[in-house]
């Protein structure tokens, strides 16, 4: 589907409503700086608080702006298989290139339940499906063996966003899924694990940091793929303070504050999320200045 950087883009709000004008500026900023895909309505896009009509508006506008230049992948995960399928079919109807389907959360399915969840959805859509493993939020972990089983059996499941920070799991997930199917893709779901995942044989990152620093995140991956390991490592090291600062509070609270400081969006979230503290805003201001982004 893509190699490199897919930006998990924020959803701007203004006075409680979608701010499509600011959103267009942000999408164009991503395109101008060479990102390889956009992921709409993921965790960073505050998908739990965006209603069905707003989803349609946001996805449609994204597809209009992008105009086929890069893939548009839509977040479509819930903890109900049938509700998830409904969101997948909406994305399919709107013309998305793929869907990001988070593991069912709260109800804590077994590994067999996870497999059957993705099997059920994959049999009912032609879209490429990306498994999203983020156990820190969901309470359930896709084991490498399960990811490999999915890769082997479900041909329109194109890859996994691996947001388990454990480096042993990253290694095993990349190794076992690539053995199961050579074209199965593994993206880091944690910006600070991107360089490591690339070294393990992965394919890039679905990134929060690239909302703010798309050029630098693209460079990190591009240099690695070009064989310039030390240059890629250097870019990673320079980005570390920003990677750390953007997660001092729950994502997407800090990244929205950073984009507000940069003049892209209002610093507005929907409850139960609230804007960043003054301490966090000051930290972000300093890090953005040091990074040459302010």
From Swiss-Prot:
The keyword Heme does not apply. The active site is at residues 132, 161. Is not inhibited by (S)-lysine, in contrast to E.coli DapA. Pathway: Amino-acid biosynthesis; L-lysine biosynthesis via DAP pathway; (S)-tetrahydrodipicolinate from L-aspartate: step 3/4. Highly thermostable. Retains over 60% of the activity after 7 hours incubation at 90 degrees Celsius. Pyruvate binds at residues 44, 206. InterPro entries: Aldolase_TIM, DapA, DapA-like, Schiff_base-form_aldolases_AS, Schiff_base-form_aldolases_CS. GO terms for biological process: diaminopimelate biosynthetic process; lysine biosynthetic process via diaminopimelate. Its EC number is 4.3.3.7. Its main location: cytoplasm. One of its GO terms (molecular function) is 4-hydroxy-tetrahydrodipicolinate synthase activity. Pfam families: DHDPS. Keywords: Amino-acid biosynthesis, Cytoplasm, Diaminopimelate biosynthesis, Lyase, Lysine biosynthesis, Schiff base. It is an enzyme of class 4 (lyase). GO terms for cellular component: cytosol. SUPFAM superfamilies: Aldolase. It is found in: Cytoplasm. The record marks 43, 106 as: Part of a proton relay during catalysis. It catalyses: L-aspartate 4-semialdehyde + pyruvate = (2S,4S)-4-hydroxy-2,3,4,5-tetrahydrodipicolinate + H2O + H(+). Catalyzes the condensation of (S)-aspartate-beta-semialdehyde [(S)-ASA] and pyruvate to 4-hydroxy-tetrahydrodipicolinate (HTPA). Homotetramer; dimer of dimers. Belongs to the DapA family. PANTHER family: 4-HYDROXY-2-OXOGLUTARATE ALDOLASE, MITOCHONDRIAL (PTHR12128:SF66), DIHYDRODIPICOLINATE SYNTHASE (PTHR12128). This is 4-hydroxy-tetrahydrodipicolinate synthase. It comes from Thermotoga maritima (strain ATCC 43589 / DSM 3109 / JCM 10099 / NBRC 100826 / MSB8). The gene is dapA.
């Amino acid at each position: 589907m893509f190699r490199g950087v897919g930006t998990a883009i924020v959803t701007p709000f203004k006075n409680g409503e979608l701010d499509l004008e600011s959103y267009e500026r942000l999408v164009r900023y991503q395109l101008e700086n060479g990102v390889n895909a956009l992921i709409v309505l993921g965790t960073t896009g505050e998908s739990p608080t965006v209603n069905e009509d707003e989803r349609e508006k946001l996805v449609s506008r994204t597809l209009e702006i992008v105009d086929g230049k890069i893939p548009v992948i839509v977040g479509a995960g819930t903890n109900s298989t049938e509700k998830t399928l409904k969101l997948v079919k909406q994305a399919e109807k709107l013309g998305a290139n793929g869907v990001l389907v988070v593991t069912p959360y709260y109800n804590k399915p077994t590994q067999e339940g996870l497999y059957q969840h993705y099997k059920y959805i994959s049999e009912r859509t032609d879209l490429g499906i990306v498994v999203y493993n983020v156990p820190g939020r969901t309470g359930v972990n896709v084991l490498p063996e399960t990811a490999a089983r999915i890769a082997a059996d479900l041909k329109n499941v194109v890859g996994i966003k691996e947001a388990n920070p454990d480096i042993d799991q990253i290694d095993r997930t990349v190794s076992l899924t690539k053995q199961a199917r050579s074209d199965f893709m593994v993206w880091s779901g944690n910006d600070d694990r991107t360089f490591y995942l690339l070294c393990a044989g992965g394919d890039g990152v679905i990134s929060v940091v690239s909302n703010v620093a798309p050029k630098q995140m693209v460079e990190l991956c591009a240099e690695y793929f070009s064989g310039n390991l030390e240059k890629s490592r250097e870019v990673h090291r320079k980005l570390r303070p920003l990677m750390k600062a953007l997660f001092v509070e729950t994502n997407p609270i800090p990244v929205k504050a950073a984009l507000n400081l940069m003049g892209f969006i209002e610093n507005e979230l929907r409850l139960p999320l609230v804007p960043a503290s003054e301490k966090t805003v000051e930290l972000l201001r300093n890090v953005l200045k040091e990074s040459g982004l302010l």
